[in-house]
């Protein structure tokens, strides 16, 4: 959420930042609503002040036995009692309109973010490792997995398209990957493990920016009785399935003031995530690349404004370390202004090399690390008490540390062997009971 005072102070800068994101200027429209809101608030406050003053004057007039003046003042107060609710309603309506308009506008990019329209304008930052050479043609994970327990047919019977059932060695391998990531972040990177609810309220979704703009991309759960309830009750009492643990973790500080000594607050969770993928029709229809349900390790940091940029670099390094220890080839890119997420000021994507994708392999996103400034904090009313005693908005950051399903794909395709088996990376073998190869079982 944007601060209308900042827009008022620098409308040209606000519009210029929106233009960098490919959006039209909004300051004139927002400031017109703000002017109407401020005028309505002033009129309401003046009416209240006049009513209070007139009420006092009535007592003075009666004391002075000035019946005519007392009568006139009483008539004035009666009129104010009639008009004040209308003035208060006008102020509330303008306030809600401004909040609604502000809530639909994305965060502003930092100055160092590269300008661009889409993913083709993203900038490569660095690369780790190199592509492996194979004595055979690498196969995609869905072909490898067909003999190892990757079952899309059963999943379709259970839930429809974009779901998968993993069995035997593959189920164990995915569990091992997630546990390895969680252990790394909690024992070496200083993150506190959280096991959050998977169902959250509307205001929680609003806090991190999923609502109102991306309502169609969410899965919603409702009690049976609400299916026959009026539409308004259905929307207010529903619960959303988290599209990422970022939603739950970040909102742990909503409507609160934490002490500066508690920051930075670093949180992590390994959870299922649920996405409707409303805009992904026809994309990545094969395999596990794009699923309605998937597992992810999420990293969230709550910081002061002065430390958020350094924390962003630290978070990226933590996510990268996962892939380094798995010895997976990857690259880091800085997203351009036209490809950033709604709540982000700046985003790094980590793309892992998948040798079985496309014609000869492809880089695919496995992690996205973003710094959001105070954008989410304003939506959540999340603040910290600084050393001077004044409450200020925190800065929030989030990143995948990493997507477990896509890490499984990368391991399967990178460590595939000619006989169709998968060599288990060294770092995962302790989580697999010492198993070194996942192979088809007789």
From Swiss-Prot:
Functional pathway: Aminoacyl-tRNA biosynthesis; selenocysteinyl-tRNA(Sec) biosynthesis; L-seryl-tRNA(Sec) from L-serine and tRNA(Sec): step 1/1
GO annotation, biological process: selenocysteine biosynthetic process; seryl-tRNA aminoacylation
Residues that bind ATP: 275-277, 365-368
Cystine residue pairs: none
Keywords on record: Aminoacyl-tRNA synthetase, ATP-binding, Cytoplasm, Ligase, Nucleotide-binding, Protein biosynthesis
Molecular functions (GO terms): ATP binding; serine-tRNA ligase activity
Subcellular localization, as worded in the UniProt entry: Cytoplasm
Residue positions binding L-serine: 244-246, 298, 400
Gene Ontology cellular component list: cytoplasm
Pfam family of the protein (one): Seryl_tRNA_N
Family, per entry: Belongs to the class-II aminoacyl-tRNA synthetase family. Type-1 seryl-tRNA synthetase subfamily.
Main function: Catalyzes the attachment of serine to tRNA(Ser). Is also able to aminoacylate tRNA(Sec) with serine, to form the misacylated tRNA L-seryl-tRNA(Sec), which will be further converted into selenocysteinyl-tRNA(Sec).
Recorded domain comment: Consists of two distinct domains, a catalytic core and a N-terminal extension that is involved in tRNA binding.
Subunit organization: Homodimer. The tRNA molecule binds across the dimer.
Protein name, entry field: Serine--tRNA ligase
Source organism (scientific name): Bradyrhizobium sp. (strain BTAi1 / ATCC BAA-1182)
Gene giving rise to this polypeptide: serS
